[in-house]
Structures are given as C-alpha cells and as structure tokens.
Amino acid sequence: MTKGIVLSLYDFTGEALRPWAEAGYHCYAFDIQHPEIGKRDTFEGGGYIEYIQMDLWNLNNIDLLQNWFKNENVVFGMAFPVCTDLAVSGAAHFARKAKADPEFQIKASNHARWCASLFGALGVPYFIENPVSRLSTLWRKPDHSFHPYEYGEYIPDAEAE
C-alpha cells in the first residue's frame, strides 16, 4: 500500500522525489524532456519515480493532470517552472525579449501560477522553486527563500564534472 502520491512538475532529474520514493511514496516527474515512453525507477521501500513526458506550457495538460489526480491520494506537490524569462540574472536580455514579445514575462509567470492552481485544486501542500526573479513582482513574494548551498553537499573530485 502506498503512503500517497507526490507530483513534481518541470522535473527532469527526479532528484527532489528520491527521498519520497525511498520512503514508499509513488512519485511522478513530469517534464517535456522525458522520452515519449517513460521509465520507472523503483526503490526498496516500495516507492517509485515514474518519469512522464508532458508539455507543461500547455494549459490543457495542467487541466489533464488535475483530472488524472483529483480522486487520488496526492499528498505533496513541487514544481520547478522554467525561469529563463524571469530570473534577474538574465535582466540584460529583458529589453530585447520585450521588444519581440511585450508579454513574455507575463506568459512565463503564468507557468508558476498554473502549478499553484493545480496544487490548490488538489488540496495539497506544495512548493514552487524559482531563483530571484520578476516572479515576486508579477505574481507574489515567496514564503521562503534559500541559497542552494544550504541544501547541497561536497562533491568528491571523482564525481565532479
């Protein structure tokens, strides 16, 4: 018997799901980069991570996820929407992008909003990860902020790229 379902959107690696799967949860990582025929990693604790290809920039697919999981035991959600058009590290390119599409940042911020709407409709706690960005202005301020080094660990030379 599963402890519940954990959803992760815009998630290619599934790394954030690993502790959940190891603890016996059924986890789903959705990302457009996954192969059409997904794969499943299983863990000793009875959990798994299933990798599913999905274009999350298509609102119809967000609605599809809501329909798939609305009657399931979803216990947590996480999302890592693309930050390319929002992160302040790319501010030097904002003017050029706005010239091509004045709505480019509104469109980009919608992806985070859609994730929040999905998790809200499913009634589950969640987080949406994004670096320092225009999201704070276009949508809402974060409830929590952190630096990646706070959650990382030392990488031995043999494992470094």
Q: What are these model-derived regions, one by one?
A:
Residues 1-161:
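Conserved active-site and SAM-binding loop architecture
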